[in-house]
UniProtKB/Swiss-Prot annotation:
Protein name per the record: S-methyl-5'-thioadenosine phosphorylase
Main location: cytoplasm
Entry-linked NCBIfam families: MTAP
Native source organism of the sequence: Mus musculus (Mouse)
Keyword Amino-acid biosynthesis attached: no
Modification N6-acetyllysine occurs at: K51
């Protein structure tokens, strides 16, 4: 167990995906509109607590779901959460299953990604007038925080949720869904699920020295599976509505556990990795 001072240093950012951005999970909610060097985040930051753990909720696509995946300001979102003092970011995301055993309604605690995006800034060090100075070559062998993932996995087991302890997610540009040929190719690559938002979010969190973990909720079998209805907006929303309480339950139980743990070494290692990955400009 952590000491009292260590506990107060933990603040959890929650980025809610499609159907999973309900602010009601927070107690004592207040709204805070912020700006960043990269522009405005997707919406107001919702500040509050989950069982005495400070939390900040952000709707990835905006509270009215008006921002498509390619247009989400991922840089501003992560920057804003970092500036607000978040040590951790736990995100939820809808995804399509590429594996028979990952059924609609199942959760996957992602451990790897494949990037198929093409239009999104992936670094805070992008050479723009507002960017940090230098060039960052952040290691990505372990994109997601293993310690945070382990807490999510163990909590899901205790809650009796259908949850897969690892999975590789392929992030596509969107907003369209995959073709059948693409879906079949992703399977041969070893991908387990497909979505539109994990990259560059996870990369930017790593650059920011934040413990980042993702709860992926399978809503469908994408379109690779014969004799199965292909993914559709209606189907995704229906499954998310039916299963949103599972993700809420996992967050509400996991976050107090995270708040009771010692994170100083983990956070120090992440900070050092981020710092030593930057090549400063020559003078």
């Amino acid at each position: 167990m952590a000491s009292g001072s260590a506990c107060t240093a933990v603040k959890i950012g929650i980025i809610g995906g499609t159907g999973l951005d309900d602010p009601e999970i927070l107690e004592g909610r207040t709204e805070k509109y912020v700006d960043t060097p990269f522009g405005k985040p997707s919406d107001a930051l919702i500040l509050g607590k989950i069982k005495n753990v400070d939390c900040v909720l952000l709707a990835r696509h905006g509270r009215q779901h008006t921002i498509m995946p390619s247009k989400v300001n991922y840089q501003a979102n992560i920057w804003a959460l970092k500036e607000e003092g978040c040590t951790h970011v736990i995100v939820t995301t809808a995804c399509g299953s590429l594996r028979e055993e990952i059924q609609p309604g199942d959760m996957v605690i992602i451990d790897q990604f494949i990037d198929r995006t093409s239009l999104r800034p992936q670094t805070f060090y992008d050479g723009s007038h507002c960017s940090a100075r230098g060039v960052c070559h952040i290691p990505m062998a372990e994109p997601f925080c293993p310690k945070t993932r382990e807490v999510l996995i163990e909590t899901a087991k205790k809650l009796g949720l259908r949850c897969h302890s690892k999975g590789t997610i392929v992030t596509i540009e969107g907003p369209r869904f995959s073709s059948r040929a693409e879906s079949l190719i992703f399977r041969t690559w070893g991908a387990d699920v497909v979505n539109m938002t994990t990259v560059p979010e996870v990369v930017l969190a790593k650059e920011a020295g934040i413990c980042y973990a993702s709860i992926a909720m399978a809503t469908d079998y994408d379109c690779w599976k014969e004799h199965e209805e292909a993914v559709s907006v209606d189907g995704v929303l229906k499954t998310m509505k039916e299963n949103a309480n599972k993700a809420k339950s996992l967050l509400l139980t996991t976050i107090p556990q995270i708040g009771s743990m010692e994170w100083s070494e983990t956070l120090r290692n992440l900070k050092n990795m981020a710092q030593f990955s930057v090549l400063p400009p020559r003078h």
